[in-house]
């Protein structure tokens, strides 16, 4: 059975000082529950984003679904576009292998 995982934000900031971790967690887990892997953090006050690019791409290729907010952050950082390019390249490679057989 395949576990559905999501890439989403968990709030760890204090009152009126939001700060979020970008984490991979089970889709059915609570928003601030236990997570599988920490992929970076986001500070909306300063507009600062720190991401682990390779880990994010690996999780996306394994089928993790980003939340809308995380998808927007990944798009702004150029990671989502890179993931789509990798996905298309893999499709073309598989099609070429299937055609060769």
Curated annotation (Swiss-Prot):
Keywords: Ribonucleoprotein, Ribosomal protein
GO CC, any one term: cytoplasm
Pfam families assigned: Ribosomal_S16
Domain of life: Bacteria
Any GO MF annotation of the entry: structural constituent of ribosome
Annotated GO biological process: translation
Family statement drawn from the similarity comment of this UniProt entry: Belongs to the bacterial ribosomal protein bS16 family.
Protein name: Small ribosomal subunit protein bS16
Gene source species: Ureaplasma urealyticum serovar 10 (strain ATCC 33699 / Western)
Record lineage: Bacteria, Bacillati, Mycoplasmatota, Mycoplasmoidales, Mycoplasmoidaceae
């Amino acid at each position: 059975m395949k576990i559905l995982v999501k890439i989403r934000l968990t709030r760890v900031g204090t009152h009126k000082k939001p700060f979020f971790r970008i984490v991979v967690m089970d889709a059915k887990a609570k928003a601030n529950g236990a997570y599988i892997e920490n992929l970076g953090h986001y500070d909306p006050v300063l507009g600062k984003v720190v991401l682990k690019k390779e880990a994010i791409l690996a999780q996306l290729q394994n089928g993790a679904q980003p939340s809308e907010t995380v998808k927007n952050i990944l798009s702004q950082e150029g990671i989502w576009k890179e993931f789509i390019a990798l996905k298309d390249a893999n499709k073309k490679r598989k099609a070429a292998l299937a055609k060769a057989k």
